[in-house]
């Protein structure tokens, strides 16, 4: 049963190293405190996409994707996704590589609780988004398993978006806030644990 599986944030999870377990963090920018630095999308070379919970959406078959004007041409000019979609503050906010992130606030009408997506390098996350923090040895381990970090993250994202995991999260959820502790407690068996260990030994 799922309750027997290792939890994402466990010390004995396949992704954990001696130094660090997988941590889930809230997005680096507090949207209220930095409201003057967040503006509507305006494409220039230096524009940095600002990703909020509202940018996580699903297609008609339930695949999660990021609906943000930096990556899609089909967003109407007055759409909510265009507002507060660009970081216009100081550029010294740390730039992260690609990472896995999840909507932190669930809308009443959405069927899924968990909406995970791979966020491209250089994007800035608001605090309506949670993301998985992995140190370099963990990222290296994922890369070795799948040959390429981007592919590894997309593959892991598929696992995190699985229906049974979403059902589990719904069964245990207290409210419409998806917090980092809840995500670290997700039972996640990645399914490559044995094959990779054999390859390493």
Predicted regions span which residues?
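Polybasic, glycine- and aromatic-enriched phosphate-binding surface used to engage nucleic acids
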Residues: 1-200
């Amino acid at each position: 049963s799922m309750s027997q599986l290792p939890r994402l944030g466990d010390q004995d999870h396949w992704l954990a190293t001696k130094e660090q377990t997988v941590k889930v963090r809230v997005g680096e920018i507090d949207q209220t405190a930095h409201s003057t630095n967040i503006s509507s999308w305006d494409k220039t070379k230096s524009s940095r996409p600002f990703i909020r919970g509202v940018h996580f959406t699903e297609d008609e078959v339930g695949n999660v994707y990021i609906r943000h004007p930096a990556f899609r041409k089909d967003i109407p000019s007055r759409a909510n996704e265009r507002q507060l979609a660009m970081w216009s503050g100081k550029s010294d906010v740390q730039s992260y590589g690609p990472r896995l992130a999840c909507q932190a606030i669930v809308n009443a009408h959405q069927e899924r609780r968990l909406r995970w997506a791979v966020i491209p390098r250089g994007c800035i996350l608001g605090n309506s988004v949670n993301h998985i923090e992995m140190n370099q040895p963990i990222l290296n381990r994922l890369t070795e398993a799948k040959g390429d970090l981007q592919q590894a993250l997309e593959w892991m994202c598929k696992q995190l978006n699985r229906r049974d995991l979403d059902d589990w999260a719904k069964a245990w959820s207290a409210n419409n806030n998806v917090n980092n502790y809840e995500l670290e407690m997700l039972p996640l068996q990645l399914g490559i644990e044995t094959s990779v260990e054999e390859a390493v030994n």
